[in-house]
């Protein structure tokens, strides 16, 4: 008798995706982050669902409903902090996942990569709207500042901002629609992740060497299921430690003050995972220029396959490109630090230099270095 997992219409999809999937024998722990992102998404959807049962999206009661969740709901504090810090874990995994793709040339799978970029935008939009919901000072002013950036769009800018706000300022209409979008988007993300996997399984996984691995495949289960479970356990351990020992480590103290349109916080800044893009935005004195740089800082990922000039796919055997990759990582960490600093000397000039270096590395220096490495192969 044929095994049910190979014949049942639903089971055979799961079987071909997670059990009998032929996988390269040499993929490292850097390939764990896809499954970790799936776990993060499940954690976020489940905790978010339970939070939505007690949350009210009204400007008068939003802040107190979050307080009510933390004080009066059974394990409400745990659900709330799992959700808040789960977002941070989500972005850590996302950045490492994208970094892995850049380093090992996974962007050569065009459909998979482009859907990944779309997923990154969707997750960032969801996180931004979620940050507005507790209706603290940083929620309100963050929403005001970021939505206001759209007014830089010529001709339709100011109308567009008022359309998004649902009025003449960030108010009840804005909060209600942000809650609605924040609730629906994770399901869109889950669907996109399914398509992401679908395209990945059309080509099969990349591997650290960047070479074809058709001659050396192993079944996904048990080898990589066990490997993924180890990653999941580490993720849950880190998240649990964060939630139980220092839940507010990555948050902003200003968000424990209820939103007040008459009182602007001294330093308006987004959550830590947006600081690198925020630093790029602030480093350009012109409003429209800043907005374009902000969008391009993420959208540039979609152009990476076009900028691939090397004869080799992976950076595994390209020492000069490796050095530049780690300079890029250091540059992004610098931008993240600058994004959290006040707009004053010397932070302004450091931010501007780091922003220029970011775009120069990706658009000019790395492609030219790859061409240079191609010539080294001839010697």
From Swiss-Prot:
Query: Cellular location of this protein?
Result: Mitochondrion inner membrane
What this protein needs as a cofactor is: heme b
- Keywords assigned by UniProt? Electron transport, Heme, Iron, Membrane, Metal-binding, Mitochondrion, Mitochondrion inner membrane, Respiratory chain, Transmembrane, Transmembrane helix, Transport, Ubiquinone
What SUPFAM superfamilies does the database record attribute to this sequence? a domain/subunit of cytochrome bc1 complex (Ubiquinol-cytochrome c reductase), Transmembrane di-heme cytochromes
Q: Which InterPro entries match?
A: Cyt_b/b6_C, Cyt_b/b6_C_sf, Cyt_b/b6_N, Cytb/b6-like_sf, Cytochrome_b, Cytochrome_b_C_euk/bac, Cytochrome_b_N_euk/bac, Di-haem_cyt_TM
Q: What does the cofactor field's note say?
A: Binds 2 heme b groups non-covalently.
Q: Which GO terms describe its cellular component?
A: mitochondrial inner membrane; respiratory chain complex III
Residues binding a ubiquinone are 201
Q: Quote the Pfam families the UniProt record gives.
A: Cytochrom_B_C (PF00032), Cytochrome_B (PF00033)
Please tell me where heme b b562 binds in this chain: 83, 182
- Membrane topology, from the record: Multi-pass membrane protein
Segments crossing the lipid bilayer: 33-53, 77-98, 113-133, 178-198, 226-246, 288-308, 320-340, 347-367
Q: Name one GO molecular function term.
A: ubiquinol-cytochrome-c reductase activity
Q: How does this chain assemble?
A: The cytochrome bc1 complex contains 11 subunits: 3 respiratory subunits (MT-CYB, CYC1 and UQCRFS1), 2 core proteins (UQCRC1 and UQCRC2) and 6 low-molecular weight proteins (UQCRH/QCR6, UQCRB/QCR7, UQCRQ/QCR8, UQCR10/QCR9, UQCR11/QCR10 and a cleavage product of UQCRFS1). This cytochrome bc1 complex then forms a dimer.
Q: What does this protein do?
A: Component of the ubiquinol-cytochrome c reductase complex (complex III or cytochrome b-c1 complex) that is part of the mitochondrial respiratory chain. The b-c1 complex mediates electron transfer from ubiquinol to cytochrome c. Contributes to the generation of a proton gradient across the mitochondrial membrane that is then used for ATP synthesis.
User: Which family is annotated?
Assistant: Belongs to the cytochrome b family.
Q: Please, what other remarks does the record include?
A: Heme 1 (or BL or b562) is low-potential and absorbs at about 562 nm, and heme 2 (or BH or b566) is high-potential and absorbs at about 566 nm.
**What is the official name of this protein in its record?**
Cytochrome b
Q: State the organism named in the record.
A: Blarina hylophaga (Elliot's short-tailed shrew)
């Amino acid at each position: 008798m044929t095994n049910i997992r190979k014949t049942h219409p639903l089971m055979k999809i799961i079987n071909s995706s997670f059990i009998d999937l032929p996988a390269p024998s040499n993929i490292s722990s850097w390939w764990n982050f896809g499954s970790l992102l799936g776990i993060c998404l499940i954690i976020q959807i489940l905790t978010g669902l339970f939070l939505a049962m007690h949350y009210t999206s009204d400007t008068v009661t939003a802040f107190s409903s979050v307080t009510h969740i933390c004080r009066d709901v059974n394990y409400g504090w745990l659900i709330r902090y799992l959700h808040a810090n789960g977002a941070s874990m989500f972005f850590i995994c996302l950045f490492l996942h994208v970094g892995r793709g850049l380093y090992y040339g996974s962007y050569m799978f065009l459909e998979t990569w482009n859907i990944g970029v779309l997923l990154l935008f969707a997750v960032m939009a969801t996180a931004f709207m979620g940050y507005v919901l507790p209706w603290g000072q940083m929620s309100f002013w963050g929403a005001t500042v970021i939505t206001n950036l759209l007014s830089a769009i010529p001709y339709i800018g100011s109308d567009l901002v008022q359309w998004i706000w649902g009025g003449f300022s960030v108010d009840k209409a804005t909060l209600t629609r942000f809650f609605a979008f924040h609730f629906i988007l994770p399901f869109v993300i889950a669907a996109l992740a399914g398509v992401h996997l679908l395209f990945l399984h059309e080509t099969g996984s990349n591997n650290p060497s960047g070479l074809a691995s058709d001659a050396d495949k192993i079944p996904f289960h048990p080898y990589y299921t066990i490997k993924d479970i180890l990653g999941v356990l580490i993720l849950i351990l880190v998240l649990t430690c964060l939630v139980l020992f220092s839940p507010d480590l990555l948050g902003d103290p200003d968000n424990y003050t209820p939103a007040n349109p008459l009182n602007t916080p001294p330093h308006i800044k987004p959550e830590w995972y947006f600081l690198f893009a925020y630093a790029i935005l602030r480093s350009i004195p012109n409003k429209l220029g800043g907005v374009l740089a902000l969008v391009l800082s993420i959208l540039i990922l979609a152009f990476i396959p076009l900028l691939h000039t090397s004869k080799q796919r992976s950076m595994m055997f390209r020492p000069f490109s490796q050095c530049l990759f780690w300079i890029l990582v250091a540059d992004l960490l610098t931008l993240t630090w600058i994004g959290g600093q006040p707009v004053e000397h010397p932070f302004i000039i450091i931010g501007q230099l780091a922003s220029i270096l970011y775009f120069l590395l990706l658009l000019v220096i790395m492609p030219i270095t790859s061409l240079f490495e191609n010539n080294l192969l001839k010697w």
